[in-house]
Amino acid sequence: MSAIEIVKVTDKKGLKQFIDFNHQLYKKSPYAAPEIREDMLYTLDPKQNEAFEFCDCECYLAKRDGKVVGRVAAIINRKANQKWDVKVVRFGWIDFIDDAKVARKLLEQVEAFGRAHGMEKIQGPLGFTDFDPEGTLIEGFDELDTMGTLYNYDYYPRIFEQLGFEKAVDWVEQIIKMPTHIPEKHKRVAELISKRYNLTVRSLRNKKDVQEFGPKIFGIINQAYSKLFGYSEMSARQAAHYISEYLPSIDLNMVCIIQEADTGELVATAISMPSMTRALQRAHGRLFPLGWIHMLDALHWHRPEIVDLMLIAVRPDHQNRGLNALLFSHLIPIYQQMGFKYAVVYPQLETNSRGVGLWDDLSPRTHRRRRCYTKPL
């Protein structure tokens, strides 16, 4: 068998090969949500992605006989390393054929990159920030993928463990059958806490709301997630990008906020959207020239049965007060009106008992589990 060559991505051709490999590897999978090519071009471009202000990154391809058989990004998040007082090199966007030799070569390259920068540990899959896909799927390979998460074949965890990697943390994903009505317990708790803490709940209404509350939403996210594994705060520039690129495309009825009634201060938020997986499959991960039609169709015209609960963030001083009941009492009627039958919760750290426990009263089923692996250098 021919030797495996590791090639650093240095130009547009190499970047195209890096992005294309994921699509080629999973094009026959009925479960994978294709990466959005335009998003990947932005994410891996140092001139565009604000994360490069505090991250170092190199991308590599594994080739055999001139054919791409694997890919990986080596990332050092200096901000996260400083915050957590660690020296970690991350590996992200890793894909490879069912061959441990290919994976070994790719990860050895990441390890070499890390050592050259004084790192002491390798961890992944992780992106630049928590808003990038993270965690290798270890359970739920026959469950529909969710946009913005990683899908991989079942040989990935076997090969990682074969190469000496161990568990760092796990994330769990839960699926909930949509209630036909607001549970009585949620109603009671929602009424109680809204009166006790003088809170109001509503959805965003228009572009003016997006401009006003967008930065505040990301401020709440930074506060709520600050103690979670590997988290580094979103900068104002990063938040501005997500606000301008993504919030306008979401039905604002599905962007929910809780405010203090007397001050108007934001204390919690929940963001959701229809599942985009089937739309992405039909669009083959391309927004242009015609892929956006499939996306708009799923967003507004022919919604799928699944709504993706992308995030819930509660200001630390209001956590453990049952604000989830207030959020769900507002959102469940909206979901029912839109025809959703199931809700899928985006990955949550298994150790985040507050977050995972939010859904207990709705009889959730853990349908997928993913893992961050680690190894000393």
Segments the model singles out, each with a brief description of its role:
Residues 48, 75-79, 312, 357-360, ...:
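Alpha-helical subdomain
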Residues 75-79, 94-96, 127-129, 179, ...:
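An acidic- and aromatic-residue-enriched active-site/binding cleft used to recognize and process polar
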Residues 21, 25, 109, 113, ...:
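Generic, well-ordered alpha-helical scaffold segments in large soluble proteins
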Residues 1-31:
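Generic start-of-chain signal for non-secretory N-termini
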Residues 3-4, 150-228:
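Acyltransferase donor/substrate-recognition loop-hinge adjacent to the catalytic core
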Residues 83-164, 283-361:
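Acyl-donor binding region in acyl/amide transferases
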Residues 22-64, 72-82, 204, 209-312:
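A conserved beta-strand-loop-helix scaffold within acyl/acetyltransferase catalytic domains
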